[in-house]
Amino acid sequence: SMIEMLGVLAIVGVLSAGAIAEFGKAVFRWKAIKCTEEYNLFISEMLVYEKDWIKMMSKQGSGHLYIGPYMEEWGMLPSSWTVSGNRFSDRLGNHIVPFVRNDLMSFSFNRRVDIDFVLSQRKGKETAEFCRLVFHNVIIPNCDRIFAIRVAEKRNDSWNNGSGWYMGCQYCRDSRNCIERINAADIESLCNVCSEEKQACNILTLF
């Protein structure tokens, strides 16, 4: 592929510093697009068993039911992901934590399958760029499947309230913030919390 060919040229010193920088951007973009493709596949696999996850949560009671170990055991993960306890890591080092919750005050948010996408903060602007790509390639195309999403950042070991909730297409009512109404400027604003090297930022997604 073109990426592999440029990589060889970079290693042998044929490319200039500027070309190497552009190569780095191209590699990141390629990996980022691959990640979003894997996210979409993962979501589809996960939602096949949505009713089963919710039944398991009902038997457990309150708290969180982490479904990652089951998905790993059943071979539902992309081959490029690594596993650490209840969370997965993609090829860019972002963490994916799938679970069912039963601990929010609003009952309508409980007993839903969630994915917490915790984005790597080491890359600053690259993380914000990836956040925007997740919105364009994952969140918006899955609007009909999603109940709600929000973006938040972690400072001093605690998560803030973030952006507030944006409702999925089937739950967009009246004056609510809705995914189907999000434009490019909104995405830019939402993903700005990921642009600095803070502890973490996440896109919490409820289905």
PLM feature spans:
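Short, glycine/small-hydrophobic-rich surface segments
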Residues: 46-84
